C-alpha cells in the first residue's frame, strides 16, 4: 500500500481514503484526494501543485496515467470511472460512469459527460464539452454516436474495485455489488 513520504507541496498533502488502494509505485504530490474503494495502479503520477486533483469513489486509474492541473482548472474524476493505461488528464472534469481509453488525452477545461466513452488514443481538446453518453474517437476527438454501455462501464469499475480489494484484504462489497465471471452479482 502507498505510504505518504515527502509528498507535501506548499503545505498540501495527498488525502487517501483508508479503503482506497494506491500502489507503492505511484507518485502523488500536493492536493490530491482519492475516494473510497478507488485504486491508483503502478506508475500513476498525480501532481496537485497549483490546483487540486479529486478521484471519486470506486474509480480506477490504471498504470502510467498522468493527472495534472492548471492554475484555473482542477482535475476532477467522478465515481465509477475507469482511466485506461497511459492516459493523460490535464485540468479537466470527468463525470461519473465514464471510460477513458488507453492513451487518450483530455486537455484543460474539457468536460466529459456522464456515461461517455473516450476511445483509446483519442484527443479531447481544451474546453471541449462532451455531452453525456457520447462515444468520442480520433485526433482531434469527434463524437461519433451516442452509446448505451453504462452497465459495461459500471462493471469495469466494480471489477477493478473487487480485484484489488480481495487481493489486499479490503472489504469489497460496497452496496452489495461484487464482480464475478464478467458480471456484477
Which role fits each region the language model picked out?
Residues 30, 42, 48, 63, ...:
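Residues on the solvent-exposed faces and adjacent turns
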Residues 1-11, 15, 49, 57, ...:
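Glycine-rich hexapeptide-repeat left-handed beta-helix
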